[in-house]
């Protein structure tokens, strides 16, 4: 965004990008943006704005844009929809052709993770809507304008493992997973596709290739390049929630399947 000082993270696509480290690099009350991940489908932009940061309403005519919300509270007014206040763990979508006006409203800084097209720009400006209509009335996921983490926890509860497909479009699939400590998934790898996660709550241990496992917590991002085997386990004493970002047509090769090809990157 034009009104944010844009810095490229020291190294893009780190195995773990720590929430505390990125926030620690910038003054609390300043607008800034960093690009921690470029996965071939998306440019992922970590954006901070203190309340009062001027909006920059604009339109992307040929791709959908979405955001994972972190610290603070951010108000989205998308297309003709009524404004929505989004907070930690929520996902917002601006469908192609829908103007979006984004305003940080609460917290010392409001943090959002923008998942945008690599060639995104703000050249086409939006105008205020001439009327407002309710958001997502009577609709179910995926691809709600606003996926509320609070609502998901009320719907699914916290007494079981569950998954919710939040976004499925031509570029991305965003899957929300709630898991109990000790839950471990089968090890697999994906051809031709980088993959990453945003940890929303709890602690998750990521075992990637033959490297030492790494543990990530709330607000951290974890990145795995295509062709690299990995599996995850929730650790600690409380459930974890993560958002997994992949291509829509994801292919799994399981390492315990004797007929599956071996992972080229281990």
Annotate the PLM regions.
Residues 93, 107-125, 223, 237-255:
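A short hydrophobic beta-strand segment most commonly corresponding to one strand
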Residues 80-96, 210-226:
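Short acidic-glycine-tyrosine-enriched beta hairpin
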Residues 40, 62, 81, 107-108, ...:
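Short strand-connecting beta-turns/loops that link adjacent beta-strands
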Residues 2-43, 56, 122-180, 184-187, ...:
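A short, N-terminal "cap"/entry segment at the start of jelly-roll beta-barrel domains
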Residues 98-101, 228-231:
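Short, charged beta-turn/beta-strand-edge "cap" motif at the junction between a beta-strand
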């Amino acid at each position: 965004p034009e009104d944010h000082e844009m810095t490229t993270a020291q190294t893009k696509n780190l195995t773990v990008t720590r929430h505390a480290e990125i926030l620690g690099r910038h003054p609390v009350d300043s607008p800034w943006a960093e690009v921690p991940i470029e996965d071939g489908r998306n440019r992922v932009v970590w954006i901070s704005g203190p309340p009062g940061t001027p909006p920059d309403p604009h339109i992307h005519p040929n791709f959908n844009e979405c955001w994972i919300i972190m610290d603070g509270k951010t108000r989205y007014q998308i297309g003709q929809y009524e404004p929505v206040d989004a907070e930690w763990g929520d996902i917002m979508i601006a469908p192609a052709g829908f103007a979006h006006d984004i305003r940080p409203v609460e917290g010392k800084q409001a943090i959002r993770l923008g998942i945008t097209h690599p060639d995104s720009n703000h050249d086409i400006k939006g105008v205020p809507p001439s009327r407002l209509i309710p958001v997502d009335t009577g609709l179910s996921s995926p691809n709600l304008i606003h996926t509320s983490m609070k609502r998901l926890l009320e719907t699914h509860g916290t007494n079981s493992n569950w998954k919710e497909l939040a976004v499925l479009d031509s570029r991305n699939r965003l899957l929300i997973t709630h898991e109990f400590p000790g839950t471990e998934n089968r090890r697999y790898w994906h051809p031709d596709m980088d993959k990453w996660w945003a940890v929303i709550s709890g602690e998750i241990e990521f075992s990637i290739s033959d490297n030492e496992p790494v543990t990530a917590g709330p607000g951290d991002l974890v990145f795995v390049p295509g062709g690299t085997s990995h599996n995850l386990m929730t650790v600690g004493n409380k459930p974890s929630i993560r958002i997994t970002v992949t291509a829509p047509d994801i292919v799994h090769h399981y390492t315990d399947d004797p007929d599956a090809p071996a992972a080229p990157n281990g």
